[in-house]
């Protein structure tokens, strides 16, 4: 059993993520300052809400440098929903710079005549390449989304799965070495979400 640090900065779906991980019999530490990180084997950055308030709240915890150093050192890290978006350089939603850990931008989901924004509901993951959480030919994995913005990484090779949005494809998951992140909510995605969390936990270094 690995100690998993769940970053608590006032913008997260803390309760539901904690409950999901505890159901997998994992030990969770709520991280509110950098002194609590040292005992963790992996970190999760969850998030629900808007980009600028999230960056401001994260800044108040004084954890930003620690998060960057954590990822740079090769330790396991998972971003969830807004937690994925904060990893990027900027967002159409706000004016404050993101963490810049992943090159690219967060863009407003395009308005399509046959689709609604926010993009809410169950959608099938479409794997794009080999990765730690999904096999390339693994289909019928439905997960739950709630978002109005989507990630556009500068390097498309970071994308490990997309989701269909009308005629468009939106980024659903990214992976780079020890860093993984998903736009959907695995903690609200039933058996598929549980499976993906188990695989992430198994990958913890």
Curated annotation (Swiss-Prot):
This chain's function reads: IGPS catalyzes the conversion of PRFAR and glutamine to IGP, AICAR and glutamate. The HisH subunit catalyzes the hydrolysis of glutamine to glutamate and ammonia as part of the synthesis of IGP and AICAR. The resulting ammonia molecule is channeled to the active site of HisF.
Enzyme Commission numbers on file: 4.3.2.10, 3.5.1.2
This protein is called what?
Imidazole glycerol phosphate synthase subunit HisH
The set of disulfide-linked cysteines is: none
Q: Its quaternary structure?
A: Heterodimer of HisH and HisF.
One Gene Ontology cellular component term attached to this UniProt record is: cytoplasm
Molecular function (GO) terms for this protein are: glutaminase activity; imidazoleglycerol-phosphate synthase activity; lyase activity
Q: In which pathway does it act?
A: Amino-acid biosynthesis; L-histidine biosynthesis; L-histidine from 5-phospho-alpha-D-ribose 1-diphosphate: step 5/9
Q: Where is the Glutamine amidotransferase type-1 domain?
A: 3-205
**Which InterPro entries does the entry link to?**
Class_I_gatase-like, GATASE, Imidazole-glycPsynth_HisH
Q: Which organism's genome codes for this protein?
A: Prochlorococcus marinus subsp. pastoris (strain CCMP1986 / NIES-2087 / MED4)
Cite the entry's keywords alphabetically: Amino-acid biosynthesis, Cytoplasm, Glutamine amidotransferase, Histidine biosynthesis, Hydrolase, Lyase
Instruction: Tell me the active site.
Output: 81 (nucleophile), 185, 187
Lineage of origin:
Bacteria, Bacillati, Cyanobacteriota, Cyanophyceae, Synechococcales
Give any single GO term for biological process: L-histidine biosynthetic process
Looking at the Swiss-Prot or TrEMBL record, what is one Pfam family this protein matches? GATase
SUPFAM superfamilies noted in UniProt: Class I glutamine amidotransferase-like (SSF52317)
Catalysed reaction, written as an equation? 5-[(5-phospho-1-deoxy-D-ribulos-1-ylimino)methylamino]-1-(5-phospho-beta-D-ribosyl)imidazole-4-carboxamide + L-glutamine = D-erythro-1-(imidazol-4-yl)glycerol 3-phosphate + 5-amino-1-(5-phospho-beta-D-ribosyl)imidazole-4-carboxamide + L-glutamate + H(+); L-glutamine + H2O = L-glutamate + NH4(+)
Name the NCBIfam families on file. IMP_synth_hisH (TIGR01855)
Q: Which superkingdom is the protein from? A: Bacteria
